[in-house]
């Protein structure tokens, strides 16, 4: 399964969208490759894009964005505990600069973002969603990035986690994600059908806490 990050470009004119990311199974050592230096040049406003914006956003000069600010490195809080930073933040700030409006990032529970877009609390949702039929029925999504679902363990995989056979292991996952709602339940069923111990699933709404559970050893692995 793929978790696809979605970004509203032309679709921003609908004021009903949410963004995403997800994927296939893998478990591998991290790669500390060099990161290219980012450009600091300011994007030029595109009047054709500005014309596509709803009047309410154009007049305000600001677009309000709901995000789960616990998902490093895509969207998370800076050291001040207030400012939302990350890869998606930099990207969407640059996109909206082309529309000539500023961004207002509002931290939200992951499973409340789409509801917030539907209710008008947010103009846009930018976070780590999987694009699927259920969500496409609720919000406009435009894919721009694909990444595989990752199994993450402590360094060296000390519990010898095998994604294809995690029966009897403790696995942490964020609430409301496809990993929590689809992936792990399917794996759980495979375990019970085979007469093996169930996966002990730890669910938390805060991705930072999910990560901490692996770091502390409370969980053997996590899915992201």
Predicted regions located by residue number:
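Alpha-to-beta junction loops
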Residues: 101-102, 119-127, 170, 215-224
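C-terminal motif of bacterial Sec signal peptides marking the signal peptidase cleavage site
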Residues: 17-21
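Extracytoplasmic small-molecule ligand-binding "clamshell" domains
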Residues: 34, 38, 42-52, 56-125
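Acidic, polar ligand-binding/catalytic clefts
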Residues: 102-164
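Short, hydrophobic alpha-helical packing/hinge segments within bilobed ligand-binding/sensory domains
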Residues: 91-92, 113-114, 207-213, 219
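Bilobed "Venus flytrap"/periplasmic-binding protein-like clamshell domains
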Residues: 72, 84-97, 129, 148-206, ...
């Amino acid at each position: 399964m793929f978790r696809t990050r979605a970004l509203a470009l032309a679709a921003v004119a609908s004021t009903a969208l949410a963004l995403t990311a997800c994927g296939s199974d893998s478990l591998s050592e991290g790669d500390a490759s060099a990161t290219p230096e980012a450009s600091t040049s300011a994007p030029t406003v595109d009047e054709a894009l500005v014309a596509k914006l709803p009047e309410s956003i154009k007049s305000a000069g600001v677009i309000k964005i709901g995000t789960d600010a616990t998902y490093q490195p895509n969207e998370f809080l800076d050291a001040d505990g207030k400012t939302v930073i990350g890869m998606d933040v930099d990207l969407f700030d640059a996109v909206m600069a082309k529309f000539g409006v500023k961004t207002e990032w509002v931290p939200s529970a992951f499973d409340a973002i789409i509801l917030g877009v539907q209710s008008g609390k947010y103009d846009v949702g930018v976070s780590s969603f999987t694009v699927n039929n259920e969500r496409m029925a609720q919000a406009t999504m435009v894919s721009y990035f694909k990444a595989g679902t990752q199994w993450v363990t402590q360094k060296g995989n000390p519990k010898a986690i095998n994604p294809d056979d995690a029966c009897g292991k403790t696995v942490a996952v964020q609430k409301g994600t496809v990993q929590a709602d689809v992936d792990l339940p399917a794996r759980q069923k495979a375990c019970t059908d085979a007469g093996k111990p169930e996966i002990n699933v730890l669910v938390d709404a805060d991705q930072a806490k999910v990560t901490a559970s692996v770091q502390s050893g409370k969980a053997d692995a996590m899915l992201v």
